[in-house]
Amino acid sequence: MLRTSLRSVRALGSRPSAAVAGRQWQATVVRRAAVSGQRFFADDKKPVVPEPSQPAVLPASETLTSPSTPPPASPQVEPTSTVPPETTPLTPPTPEATVIPPVAEEPVVPPTLPTPRKKKGFFRRLRNFFLSLTILGAIAFGGGVYYSRINDAFHDFFTEYIPYGEQAVLYLEELDFKKRFPDVVSRVTGRPRDSGEQVKVPAQSGASWRVASGGEPAGRQSSSIKKAGAAAQDAVPKSEPAVVAAAKEDTAELPKTEATTTATPAEPAPAPAATDASGTPVKKPFKAPEVDEPSRWPPASPIDPLTVNGATDPIVQDLVKMLNDVITVINHDNANEKYAPTICKAKNELSKVADKINEMKAKVEADAAKQVKARVDGFDKAANELVSRVESAMAAQEAAWRREFEEEITRLKKSYDEKVHLIQDREHQIAEEKLNNRLLEQAIQLQRQFTENIKKHVEQERDGRLGKLNELHKAVAELERLTSGLNEVVDTNLRTQQLHVAVDAVRASLEDAHHPRPFIKELVALKEIAADDPVVDAAIASINPTAYQRGIPTTAELIDRFRRVATEVRKASLLPEDAGVASHASSYVLSKLMFKKEGLAAGDDVESILTRTQTYLEEGDLDNAAREMNGLKGWAKTLSRDWLGEVRKVLEVQQALDVIQAEARLQSLRVE
């Protein structure tokens, strides 16, 4: 073929002529034969073209001196050697010893085709699948954790149904809290907690007002004074807690006795003996110094405890008790001379405070008495007005009933007269046709019946009038009884009216809201107005807390959300319980081919239930719509579970409001 010849010529022409001339003729012939023996396949099949009359001109072997290029020599004809025998190189090795294989044994090399793509192995595809699934799962889990911190509804779903979702969300929230408040943990752990235990400080702790003795006194009495002082110092610290405790007990009982007794001046206690039963040393009475002794000031008298007349207020009693405890401690420490002015000032101020409190109480009681008297006078005036109105209404009603009775008697008499005349005329006409005797007997019989009827009706009207008078008497007695309990009736009517208004306020809040809005304030007001009514409390307790904390959707929102839920339920209407990916795909495709029903379609299939539910929703019947959706099973019920929960919240709120309104009506009927 033409392409084969061109390739062979190119292969030969690609080498330099000097290298070709330097080789032996046999090697050249072998190479040419090998090149010409190779076959190549064309990419496209070409039609067979007849050989040209002139040989093809090769550009590689074309020269400028010759007009044409001679054709290549045939591989079968060996050219005549122009090299002299003397310069002929040595004979090369035989073809069997050469490395080049023989031309006849070389296989035909097919053309190089594009290598087909190697098919991936099963384990490699499985590895890629699990790797992709792991990456997508991690991305989805991270996105769910992030979105659950933004949306509360998705937070509840994610933490409840996704494994380890709650732990991840809590961990991120804890990190966020630590980042925002880094010093909270250190402050909580570093500061000691208040355990609530009371810390008591002894009365003799700290510095004292006494001046410490600087050294031993000089004189003959130094040894005896030293021994007596040492004995007193050893005995006082041991006996002080008992004395202070006894003093506190005495002052604790003081306000109780002072509240019932009049103020009496405190008498000084008699001087105790040198030592009591427990061995506690008691101070000796003051003795005037002798002539040869230095002068001494007598000790100050102890401070009297505080007594307040009419101290019935607990706060004043506590203040008196505290001040008496302080006075007892000061007297025990012999500091009465130092703190006497301050204690006297505190006594005066406390007495003034008690007097002011008593004056304020008296003023408040007087104002309250005036208000109560004004309220009682107002209620009496309203009761008298109501009685007068009731009496006038009763008189007007009695006159109206008497007038109606007389009119009714006249009308009955007239009607019966007309009836009698008509019967007489008919009897007269019949008498003309029949015998006179039969006509007379019939006339007598008719007159007798007429008389009996008249008497009967008269007696009935008389009994009816007496019965109405008895009923009127009973009504008057009932009005008198109601007038006596007017205060209770007014309060009950007011509370019932307020309960109606509160229920209407809750309904108006729910109906006017264009989106879910909390109604906690309305429920709190309704519960306060009910005043511990068990029925109202039970109705409010039956409402889901999320309903009045976040609000409930309106009917339009429920219908809009039902349309979206119905679309998803129709896609999963043909799914079995253990459906796979193929079942989901087939159910999605088949749901597009199903015909939609209208109205109250019969049947228990998903499409019929959805059609009936939509019809009930358009009619405003949420109860039947929820019952229809509750009848779904499998994936359809799972997809509609959230919508059913919202409808249940709305129905619970409506049912609770209906119960409260019925209770209010029942209270109104009881009052009536």
UniProtKB/Swiss-Prot annotation:
It is a single-pass membrane protein. Keywords: Coiled coil, Membrane, Mitochondrion, Mitochondrion inner membrane, Transit peptide, Transmembrane, Transmembrane helix. Residues 149-672 are mitochondrial intermembrane. Belongs to the MICOS complex subunit Mic60 family. Residues 43-112, 189-305 are annotated as: Disordered. InterPro entries: MIC60. Residues 49-125 are mitochondrial matrix. PANTHER family: MICOS COMPLEX SUBUNIT MIC60 (PTHR15415:SF7), MITOFILIN (PTHR15415). Component of the mitochondrial contact site and cristae organizing system (MICOS) complex. One of its GO terms (cellular component) is MICOS complex. Residues 1-48 form a transit peptide. Component of the MICOS complex, a large protein complex of the mitochondrial inner membrane that plays crucial roles in the maintenance of crista junctions, inner membrane architecture, and formation of contact sites to the outer membrane. Plays a role in keeping cristae membranes connected to the inner boundary membrane. Also promotes protein import via the mitochondrial intermembrane space assembly (MIA) pathway. Residues 86-95 have a biased composition (Pro residues). One of its GO terms (biological process) is cristae formation. Residues 58-67, 75-85, 96-107, 257-281 have a biased composition (Low complexity). It is found in: Mitochondrion inner membrane. The chain crosses the membrane at residues 126-148. This is MICOS complex subunit mic60. Residues 403-489 form a coiled coil. Its main location: mitochondrion. Residues 247-256 have a biased composition (Basic and acidic residues).
